[in-house]
Regions:
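Catalytic-core regions of core metabolic enzymes
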Residues: 1-712
Length: 712
């Protein structure tokens, strides 16, 4: 990605002219409104674009009432935006001509660039260089264009775009996919969500998602941003913009595609993106308050609701229905989704007790029963009681429609309460589209009340709101870097790595390195039995896989165990250069944990903590944090482990020393954060002993930048 001359400021100014133009040129203009060269003209007219429109066509003197120019060089100087609706072969020349005429920015629809591989990337780089030298912002190539619904400026060939006029805070859509940028836009509009911008970034030869995000955040009409990306190309910029958005009260929602191996392969041929480390990306974005979702529906739902309300003040969700089965289903969904349906205040329960029929039970979720069909006001009274509860941050109302008359009465009763709520409310009328009269649907959407068509979808959306509410807490304390000097290319085996850990304040077992069986016997006798024998080599990363670990319970067994270990190692790794055998005290009891720290080329230093020790990869139970995570953030992340109950003392076992584990994670994070020559630190396993007894690093490896330990 390259920038126009003038650097970042020049790119930003050119993109601003492109996104909010007062004059537009269509290059390759056609009189066929269904063609790529005709659709932009038709859309500009249908939207009522208030600025100047210039047409360039080599085959037409006029299109409709507008005259056509023969070439870009005939354009008046300083047109803000040019749409290049021409074949790929003429695009480079057109960009150079646009630069000569002072055009602010160009939209390139043509494909056949970086998404095709090396040859295409070379052409894309030439295109980007021409734009940079000419000071022209460039959208695309291989994009569907941009639609500014605020200023009625559609620069796209997407025929179905409605001439929607955004007049209040809404959702800006920014996507690396043209088709999905429009799909998200149509879905949002169908839900009554105000869309302010729909931006397809394409191959991002010059401008990326982050650059457009910066611009839409300037607009007071932007209440939320829905982003769909295959690759975040400017990590530091998107994190900085997340902080800017938080200050402005704008919610950022992101769907990251290309997570699977096959999807990453497909993305190479789709937009030229190489998907980054998904877990690290999620950790970095989440901690800055960017809401990560897993589907297009979730993206539309969350962004639309957040644009309307912003994040709730509390993560608690109240669920109200007129069906006992729906109440039970909501409890199941809440458990599956990890949602908090809090207990209600006594005052709320008293109110509900007075409002509900005698055979209904006050609580959360609450089933008002079918009495709501006979007494529509019951819906509103119960909803009002729930919204007044201090533990409730958002409300889901899941109702059956009844007959057309009953459904209308339900809507009549609920709308004043729901539309006037300051807390997020989500209305779901169960049964899909069939039982909901269009008039009622329109009234709900016109009142600004989010309408989703299933309890599951509503609860998923509410869960996303709850997650953001938890993130609204004051920024947690972050760790201070600790610098360690390690030569580049060095790989420290276990004894030296444990010296590093000891200097950081981690506890390691007592032990020393032996060069032969006699020395091992002498060391073991001094330590006291039982002891552990471990082969030591920087090339030996997974000792247990190579049979390089032995356990000795009695002095008489030491020599035989020593020789047996060497024989196993000779069979498994005959070329291994051995430094010696580490003799250590045996530490038993507790829970084994993997603690690792690494550097991601995009996101920087990060931590991995997983239960299972050497079996962590098999169990797949691990969390990722950024390396500067403080104690509160680490503790919260650990509770997300499926096996966290083991640390709490499951099935009568003693609870683990969680503070000691948190301290160890924090100290390793400080080391990778402050030591630029360290590529990786791994403690595996870290044995978390019962509460008050600490945590012990049983094995360790430290790798310098450029170091390459072999697997074994």
């Amino acid at each position: 990605m390259t920038e126009p001359s003038g650097g970042e400021g020049g790119l930003r100014n050119g993109l601003r002219r492109l996104l909010r133009p007062s004059s537009v040129a269509v290059i390759g203009a056609s009189d066929d409104p269904a063609s790529i060269g005709g659709a932009p003209i038709s859309l500009l007219e249908r939207f009522g674009f208030p600025g100047e429109v210039h047409l360039v066509s080599r085959s037409r003197a006029r299109i409709g009432s507008r005259p056509c120019l023969r070439s870009i060089d005939d354009l008046p100087y300083g047109v803000d935006a040019a749409v290049l609706a021409i074949p790929r072969a003429g695009v480079l020349e057109a960009v150079e001509a646009a630069a000569r005429r002072g055009v602010g920015g160009v939209v390139v629809f043509a494909s056949g660039y970086g998404e095709l591989g090396p040859a295409g990337r070379s052409d894309e780089e030439a295109l980007a260089e021409a734009a940079r030298l000419g000071g022209v912002a460039l959208a695309g190539p291989n994009c569907l264009g941009l639609v500014n619904f605020v200023d009625a400026a559609p620069l796209t060939f997407a025929h179905a775009v409605p001439n929607w006029q955004a007049a209040e805070r809404g959702v800006a859509v920014v996507a690396q996919s043209g088709a999905l940028s429009m799909a998200l836009t149509y879905a949002a509009l169908a839900q009554g969500v105000m869309v302010t911008y729909a931006i397809s970034t394409g191959n991002e030869a010059v401008a990326g998602v982050e650059d457009y995000l910066e611009l839409v955040l300037e607009d007071e009409c932007t209440g939320a941003v829905a982003m769909l990306v295959e690759q975040v190309r400017q990590p530091s910029k998107i994190l900085a913009l997340a902080r800017t958005a938080a200050k402005k009260g704008v919610a950022l929602c992101l769907l990251h595609t290309g997570r699977s191996a096959r999807a990453r392969e497909a993305s190479l041929t789709h937009t030229g993106a190489i998907a980054g480390n998904q877990a690290v990306l999620r950790a970095a974005l989440d901690r800055e308050g960017i809401l990560l979702v897993d589907s297009l529906d979730e993206l539309v739902d969350a962004a639309g609701i957040l644009a309307r309300y912003g994040p709730p003040s509390s993560p608690g969700i109240a669920f109200m229905t007129d069906s006992g089965a729906a109440k039970t289903h909501a409890l199941d969904l809440a458990q599956d989704l990890g949602l908090d349906l809090p207990s209600l205040a006594d005052a709320t329960l008293d109110r509900l007790g007075r409002e509900l029929p005698s055979f209904a039970t006050a609580g959360n979720p609450v089933d008002i029963t079918a009495m709501g069909l006979n007494d529509p006001g019951l819906y509103a009274r119960v909803a009002g009681s729930l919204l007044d509860d201090p533990s409730v941050g958002s409300l889901v109302v899941a109702a059956m429609p009844g007959s057309d008359r009953q459904g209308t009465e339900q809507v009549d009763a609920l709308l004043p309460t729901l539309s006037g709520a300051s807390k997020p409310v989500i209305y779901t009328i169960m049964g899909g589209d069939w039982p909901l009269p269009e008039a009622n649907r329109s009234r709900i959407l016109d009142a600004g009340v989010p309408l989703l068509r299933s309890p599951e979808r509503a609860l998923r959306a509410a869960g996303h709101l709850a997650h953001l509410a938890e993130r609204r807490a004051p920024a947690a304390e972050r760790v201070r870097p600790v610098r360690l000097d390690l030569p580049e290319g060095v790989v420290l085996g276990e004894p030296a790595a444990k010296d590093i850990l000891r200097s950081l304040g981690l506890r390691v077992p007592a032990g020393s390195l032996a060069r032969d069986a006699a020395e091992a016997k002498s060391l073991a006798d001094r330590l006291g039995y039982p002891v552990v024998l471990k082969a030591v080599s920087p090339e030996l990363r997974h000792k247990s896989d190579a049979g390089a670990v032995g356990f000795v319970h009695h002095a008489d067994d030491l020599a035989a165990s020593y020789e047996s270990l060497l024989r196993r190692l000779e069979r498994a790794r005959p070329a291994l250069v051995l430094e010696g055998v580490l003799v250590e005290e045996m530490v038993r009891g507790g829970v084994e944990v993997l603690l690792g720290a690494r550097r991601d080329p995009d996101w920087g230093p990060y931590l991995v903590v997983g239960l299972g020790g050497i079996f962590t990869e098999v169990l797949g139970d691990a969390v990722v944090l950024m390396a500067d995570a403080g104690p509160a953030e680490i503790t919260e992340a650990l509770t997300g482990l499926r096996g966290f109950p083991l640390l709490e003392g499951a099935r009568g076992s003693a609870p683990g020393d969680l503070p000691a584990l948190v301290a160890a994670v924090q100290r390793v994070g400080a080391a990778i954060l402050g030591s630029p020559t360290i590529a990786e630190i791994e403690v595996n396993p870290l044995l978390v002993l019962p509460c008050g007894l600490g945590a012990v690093a049983l094995d360790a490896l430290v790798v310098g930048i450029g170091g390459t330990p072999r697997e074994g």
